[in-house]
Amino acid sequence: MNIFNNNLHETDKEINEIIKHEKLRQSNVIELIASENFVSPAVLEAQGALLTNKYAEGYPSKRFYNGCEEVDKAENLAIERVKKLFNCKYANVQPHSGSQANQAVYLALLQPGDTVLGMSLDSGGHLTHGAAPNMSGKWFNAVSYSVNKETYLIDYDEIERLADLHKPKLLIAGFSAYPRNIDFAKFREIVDKVGAYFMADIAHIAGLVATGEHQSPIPYAHAVTSTTHKTLRGPRGGLILSKDEEIGHKINSALFPGLQGGPLMHIIAAKAVAFLENLQPEYKSYIQQVISNAKALASSLQERGYDILTGGTDNHIVLVDLRKDGITGKLAANSLDRAGITCNKNAIPFDETSPFITSGIRLGTPACTTRGFKEKDFVLVGHMVADILDGLKNNEDNSALEQKVLNEVTKLIELFPFYG
């Protein structure tokens, strides 16, 4: 027997079982992690294709290896499709992740020790926007802006004051946990006053931007980064866009050979498939449903007496502030998980609790919207979440209520078939 000719279930029963069990897990829960989604069968097929065998250092028509004719076509398709999707002149589809997309922009535009101004982690920013444990916080002089202490909205006056004081080389807009729209035009006004570069990280809202449901940063930012999963419903990966082709050339060199070696051609092919899906009219309807579902989820939780940060949402994210309820984010997320609802604990702005505990939870609607959930379904989900939270306020042992909600979850998700 030649092991290299076997299928997965023949070669590695352990990994095969893990995949089977993970499929069951994904199909049997209400997925509310805001950064997760379900890719289409077409994207899955492309991602598992034999393009994984091909090394292709460099860029189309400028490779360091021969035999790249077909993968060049795949990468060019991905580039042209995403440029059309976002109406921009430059795109790089090679970043392995959103973090590496951000790193490539830093490498292209900054020198070690330069000042960067980004949203603080506890206000909803991302690790790669200057957080102390991250490379961006170690290599650069990172200054953070926060949200307003009363409204929890981005404080553009504070950003302007900090920019004038610190004269950053780069101003970063973007977030991992902020439920409201961003005024990219206002960011550009601030940037122009201090002579900085402007990077917009739209990893969470890329789908909203692509469909016109959120202001596009393309006309305002020198560089725009994103992941290709989340609201874009593609494979896990990164993306860099710009209206400025000269900056694009710098970014190309920064990513390769500056940061990465060979690109993942099977992932790039899957990105191309996702971008083609994103260009279809049905995708805009999907994004509109994602937003409507988030509003329904937020409203149902508010009706049950729970504080929703900023009073609602403009996108796919709902942040539940549990401080007045005496519940930690960790306790809530773990109890919800046992009840068949997956989300994540999340810091609340000006949170004094440990980031490993937190005072809130982050909920998101993309994944269940992909399965077919509508507003009425998310109203039910909101009440399920509230039931669990109510139980945590009143009882140390929430197991009976968790089982009750788990039964309700099972009945609801049976209406929305998963992968065949």
Swiss-Prot record:
Transferase as UniProt keyword: yes
A UniProt-annotated Pfam family: SHMT
Entry EC number(s): 2.1.2.1
Top-level taxon of the source organism: Bacteria
Gene3D superfamilies: Aspartate Aminotransferase, domain 1 (3.90.1150.10), Type I PLP-dependent aspartate aminotransferase-like (Major domain) (3.40.640.10)
Sites of N6-(pyridoxal phosphate)lysine modification: 230
Site (Plays an important role in substrate specificity): 229
PROSITE patterns (alphabetical): SHMT
Family annotation (InterPro entries): PyrdxlP-dep_Trfase, PyrdxlP-dep_Trfase_major, PyrdxlP-dep_Trfase_small, Ser_HO-MeTrfase, Ser_HO-MeTrfase-like, Ser_HO-MeTrfase_PLP_BS, SHMT-like_dom
The protein, known as: Serine hydroxymethyltransferase
Gene source species: Rickettsia peacockii (strain Rustic)
